[in-house]
Amino acid sequence: MTTVLGIEGTAWNLSAAIVDEDDVIAEVTETYRPKTGGIHPREAAQHHALHASDVIERLLKEYRDKGHSPENIDAIAFSQGPGLGACLRTVATSARALALSLDIPLVGVNHCIGHVEIGRWKTPAVDPVVLYVSGGNSQVLAHRAGKYRIFGETLDIGIGNALDKFARGAGLTHPGGPKVEEYARKATNYVKMPYVVKGMDFSFSGLSTAATDALKDNSLEDVCYSFQENAFAMLVEVTERALAHTGKSEVLLAGGVGANMRLREMLDLMCEDRGASFYVPERRFMGDNGAMIAYTGLLMFNSGTTLPIENSHVDPSFRPDTVDVTWIADEKEVL
């Protein structure tokens, strides 16, 4: 049975995990928490560099304590991108050192695809349309003709960053998304705001700015509610279009913003109307985590994909639709 150690560190979370084909065997996470404002890339990278050795040591100890030997690990996987360049480089350095130390192959994993594959692993989803929503990314994807094709995506910022930007302007503490959700539950009125869907793409920067301006004349609760309703309706609309276009019968929600219960409710209602199945992995697998990198690395390793050390550069703009999905049989579909 294949066993892979994976390291995630594209932004906030430094997380490492060891998985086999059945389950997550061990996992350790250290989260960067800024004193004020949003993420500071240099500080986040320093955090990851400071804690990387300790996280890996604790992970290997947990692995040994469960009766396993590091000699059983077949490969080291790491988040190659997309993400913050400084954070990616820090994690890549740790992964290279570990692979050389254990004399085992290295696997570079696309962070976005990691979210998709952990969702497919930990839910009954087989061939879903995926709504991937996180801080820096918002995309609608589905597997076709050997790749995860992007059917729609943000034209500017990710929904998570839009929520955080608005929350900071409203004086809410980080992370902003859960605070916005909390206040939205107490709303009594809808405030008209921009709704921007262009073809199959969406935009959030104008909505975030409009929501901040709306605080001058409306309650925080009503603005939070209206921001969520518009943003999530845009995401659900494009997901529904992709579902109709592809003819698929499953929707998978992935990424940290997927923890929002209102977004889940809206997607669930849409899927019910269309006769599609809706899947969400448990909360621990929604945000950035080492298990998703380890498991996707396992899939890649088992399909013959490894990465020479000399080619293991990171890519802060690494798009999921550039990755050959060698671990899923090509149905020879036509786009």
Curated annotation (Swiss-Prot):
Catalytic activity: L-threonylcarbamoyladenylate + adenosine(37) in tRNA = N(6)-L-threonylcarbamoyladenosine(37) in tRNA + AMP + H(+)
Gene Ontology CC, one term: EKC/KEOPS complex
Binding of substrate, residues: Y132, V133, S134, G135, G136, D164, G177, E181, N260
Top EC group: transferase
EC number(s) stated in the UniProt entry for this protein: 2.3.1.234
Superkingdom in the source lineage: Archaea
Annotated GO biological process: tRNA threonylcarbamoyladenosine modification
Keywords annotated in UniProt: Acyltransferase, Cytoplasm, Iron, Metal-binding, Transferase, tRNA processing
Binding positions (Fe cation): H111, H115, Y132, D288
Major localization class: cytoplasm
InterPro entries documented for this protein: ATPase_NBD (IPR043129), Gcp-like_dom (IPR000905), KAE1/TsaD (IPR017861), Kae1_archaea_euk (IPR034680), Peptidase_M22_CS (IPR017860)
Cofactor note: Binds 1 Fe(2+) ion per subunit.
A GO term for molecular function: N(6)-L-threonylcarbamoyladenine synthase activity
Presence of keyword Cell cycle: no
PROSITE patterns given in the database record: GLYCOPROTEASE (PS01016)
Subcellular location: Cytoplasm
Cofactor(s) of this protein: Fe(2+)
UniProt KW Chaperone keyword: no
Membership in a protein family: Belongs to the KAE1 / TsaD family.
NCBIfam families assigned: arch_KAE1, gcp_kae1, PRK09605.1
Record function comment: Required for the formation of a threonylcarbamoyl group on adenosine at position 37 (t(6)A37) in tRNAs that read codons beginning with adenine. Is a component of the KEOPS complex that is probably involved in the transfer of the threonylcarbamoyl moiety of threonylcarbamoyl-AMP (TC-AMP) to the N6 group of A37. Kae1 likely plays a direct catalytic role in this reaction, but requires other protein(s) of the complex to fulfill this activity.
Subunit structure: Monomer. Component of the KEOPS complex that consists of Kae1, Bud32, Cgi121 and Pcc1; the whole complex dimerizes.
Protein name per its UniProtKB record: tRNA N6-adenosine threonylcarbamoyltransferase
Species of origin: Methanococcoides burtonii (strain DSM 6242 / NBRC 107633 / OCM 468 / ACE-M)
